[in-house]
Amino acid sequence: NTIERLRLTGYVLNEKLQVLPEYRTAYIVLTADELKRYSSQNGDTEGLVNYGLSIKGIRLSVIISDRKENIKLSLRSLGNFSVNEMARAHFEGGGHRNAAGGQTNLTLDQTVKKFLDVLPLYKDQLIAE
């Protein structure tokens, strides 16, 4: 670990982690300025998405980050919920059932809105045991 990565992790957990219990979802949004402030390198945000899944009852965790050239999404899930399907259908991405990535050419705010607008489509799957 670098000191910058540890500081970014602390900042994210304290200030940026959002929880939507009605969707059993946690998400993090990071701006380009926030990534720059912590001297974030590619890969520094990779493990952050997993913190959301460590919260009791959470089945979907997403990090949305502004990488200047586009907006990147990293999606992780527990159980049978397929983040691969969500990433492929809505975020030009894909991967595996429980780990996927995506991207958009929308703004950061538009991407967050799209993610929040898409969640209700998956509510039944997310709240199923």
Placement of each model-derived feature along the sequence:
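Hydrophobic helix-and-loop "lid/oligomerization" segment in the mid-to-C-terminal part
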Residues: 1-90, 95-129
